[in-house]
């Protein structure tokens, strides 16, 4: 499966144009958005409309610049957007699990609780793709400067325990476009213009 993931667009027309160009030049099966498509919900409806007009299935979560309720409502009223915050989606033998918002705490008790419920949804042989706005702690995705990590420890614990094939996150703009392997997982901050990844 070929995925084009993106995060932290923050209303940028240039970023949306680059995503559209990548869709035109690559055979993409799925779009994934890890949140913050706006600056505090400015121009929300228009941005969601543009994403919908890409005409490809798009799994999306809210970031810290959007409310869960508004993102869910706009996705439900679109043709191609699927809101996956705490609502996993199965595509073939892949299961996509999203958890939006946050990005400012080391711990997320609600994520711990919900991720346990998610694991009861998973079947033997499923390949898990995790989509969060907050990056996992102590990785190349949450480093602000040398030896200073600001990510979420509960998300990191989940990744270490479950070994998803891919974990997409955003929030930390300084680490946009960073991709690397952590054990069995591809960790990715896809940046606002997007990164193509094959799983």
For the regions a language model picked out, list residue spans one by one.
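Active-site-proximal beta-strand elements of phosphoester/diester hydrolases
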Residues: 1-10, 93-102, 129-133, 186-191
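Core catalytic region of metal-dependent phosphoesterases/phosphodiesterases
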Residues: 6, 11-91, 190-193
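Binuclear metal-dependent phosphoesterase catalytic core
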Residues: 18, 88-92, 109-110, 153-165, ...
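Short, conserved loop/helix-junction motifs that constitute active-site signature segments
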Residues: 50-55, 122-124, 159-162, 182
């Amino acid at each position: 499966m070929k995925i084009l993931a993106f995060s932290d667009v923050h209303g940028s027309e240039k970023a949306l144009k680059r995503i559209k160009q990548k869709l035109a030049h690559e055979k993409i099966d799925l779009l994934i958005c890890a949140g913050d498509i706006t600056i505090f919900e400015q121009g929300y409806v228009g941005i969601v409309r543009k994403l919908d007009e890409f005409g490809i299935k798009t799994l999306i979560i809210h970031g810290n610049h959007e409310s869960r309720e508004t993102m869910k409502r706009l996705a439900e009223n679109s043709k191609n957007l699927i809101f996956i915050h705490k609502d996993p989606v199965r595509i073939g033998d892949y299961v996509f699990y999203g958890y939006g918002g946050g990005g400012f705490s080391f711990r997320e008790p609600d994520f711990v609780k919900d991720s346990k419920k998610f694991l009861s949804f998973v079947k033997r042989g499923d390949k898990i793709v995790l989509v969060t706005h907050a990056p996992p702690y102590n990785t190349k995705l949450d480093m602000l400067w040398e030896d200073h990590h600001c990510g979420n420890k509960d998300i990191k614990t989940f990744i270490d325990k479950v070994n998803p094939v891919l974990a997409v996150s955003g929030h930390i703009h300084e680490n946009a476009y960073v991709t690397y392997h952590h054990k069995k997982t591809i960790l990715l901050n896809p940046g606002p213009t997007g990164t193509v990844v094959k799983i």
